A protein has these predicted regions:
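Trafficking entry modules
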Residues: 2-111, 115-161
Length: 161
């Protein structure tokens, strides 16, 4: 009877350790996005606890959404000076995101942060231009969301070791 209790205790201990480890991993994943300024924009993109992969996934999502915003701005840039400015800054942001993606592959965290900061700045120029000119446009909304996602990405990049 004593041998059976030891086996049960051993199996129970293993089960508790595995459960605790899985909860810790899940908590770390949730904490990765919880640390960002805009966690609701982070959770759909980040799929794990690795900051490097999270940053890479966010850069790819930013590139995709930036291309869509560029296409949208291209339709309206001839009729609105502020949209034309946004079009140019979105193109700059796309360039900086490409450089950031290459930097993460080369494991150059300093360059990665620099290019991400430049992209966030580009998005901010677009948003602030609309605010300064007292205009409201769908491009502004897209650029604001991109700015927030870029801010999250920049924070994720600081977690890379």
């Amino acid at each position: 009877m004593t041998g059976c209790n030891k086996t049960q205790l051993y199996l129970t201990t293993i089960a508790v350790i595995l459960l605790t480890a899985s909860q810790a991993a899940e908590a770390h994943f949730k904490n990765l996005c919880a640390q960002t300024a805009y966690p609701r924009l982070c959770w759909p993109i980040v799929k794990g606890p690795n900051p490097r992969r999270a940053t890479h996934s966010t850069i790819r999502a930013l590139e995709t959404k930036t291309k869509l915003a560029i296409a949208q701005a291209a339709r309206y840039k001839n009729g609105n000076q502020q949209v034309a400015i946004c079009y140019a800054t979105l193109k700059d942001a796309a360039f900086n995101l490409g450089k950031a993606r290459r930097s993460i592959r080369k494991r150059n965290v300093l360059s990665l942060k620099m290019f991400l900061a430049a992209a966030v700045s580009d998005y901010g120029v677009c948003v602030n231009g609309f605010i300064d000119s007292r205009q409201v446009h769908t491009i502004q909304n897209a650029a604001d969301k991109l700015r927030k996602m870029g801010s999250n990405c920049l924070l994720l990049a600081t977690l890379i070791r």
